[in-house]
């Protein structure tokens, strides 16, 4: 029997800079089989330079996966293993789970900042 994983995206705006930034994550919710590749898209409309991907496991705080301070500027966070990102445009920052495993079941948050 194949294991199913549940990934839930949420909207999150980092508490620095402008508080009216529009940040969108797609898909909003995702269920997949173990071993499948998953892509989460983050887009923003305020032209912020900095974008971040976080993960929150049940009962724990946010953990930084990757961050970017500008287009094609990619930096690893504290838990980047098993993930990859792409930032080909200022307004978009994509997160990929290369091969979904049960311990990656979590809430995933995208954030932006202009500072």
UniProtKB/Swiss-Prot annotation:
Signal peptide coordinates: 1-21
Gene3D superfamilies cross-referenced by the UniProt entry: Immunoglobulins
Cellular location(s): Cell membrane
Keywords recorded for this protein, A-Z: Adaptive immunity, Cell membrane, Disulfide bond, Glycoprotein, Immunity, Immunoglobulin domain, Membrane, Receptor, Signal, T cell receptor
Domain of life of the native organism: Eukaryota
BP-aspect Gene Ontology terms: adaptive immune response; cell surface receptor signaling pathway
InterPro entries xref list: Ig-like_dom, Ig-like_dom_sf, Ig-like_fold, Ig_V-set, TCR_beta_variable
SMART domains reported for this sequence: IGv
Matches recorded under SUPFAM superfamilies: Immunoglobulin (SSF48726)
Main location: membrane
Glycosylated residues in this chain: 103
Disulfide bond residue pairs: 42-110
GO cellular component: plasma membrane; T cell receptor complex
Residues covered by the Ig-like domain: 22-115
PANTHER family documented for this protein: T CELL RECEPTOR BETA VARIABLE 24-1, T-CELL RECEPTOR BETA CHAIN
Functional note: V region of the variable domain of T cell receptor (TR) beta chain that participates in the antigen recognition. Alpha-beta T cell receptors are antigen specific receptors which are essential to the immune response and are present on the cell surface of T lymphocytes. Recognize peptide-major histocompatibility (MH) (pMH) complexes that are displayed by antigen presenting cells (APC), a prerequisite for efficient T cell adaptive immunity against pathogens.
Subunit structure: Alpha-beta TR is a heterodimer composed of an alpha and beta chain; disulfide-linked. The alpha-beta TR is associated with the transmembrane signaling CD3 coreceptor proteins to form the TR-CD3 (TcR or TCR). The assembly of alpha-beta TR heterodimers with CD3 occurs in the endoplasmic reticulum where a single alpha-beta TR heterodimer associates with one CD3D-CD3E heterodimer, one CD3G-CD3E heterodimer and one CD247 homodimer forming a stable octameric structure. CD3D-CD3E and CD3G-CD3E heterodimers preferentially associate with TR alpha and TR beta chains, respectively.
Name of the protein: T cell receptor beta variable 24-1
Organism: Homo sapiens (Human)
Taxonomic placement: Eukaryota, Metazoa, Chordata, Craniata, Vertebrata
Gene designation per UniProt: TRBV24-1
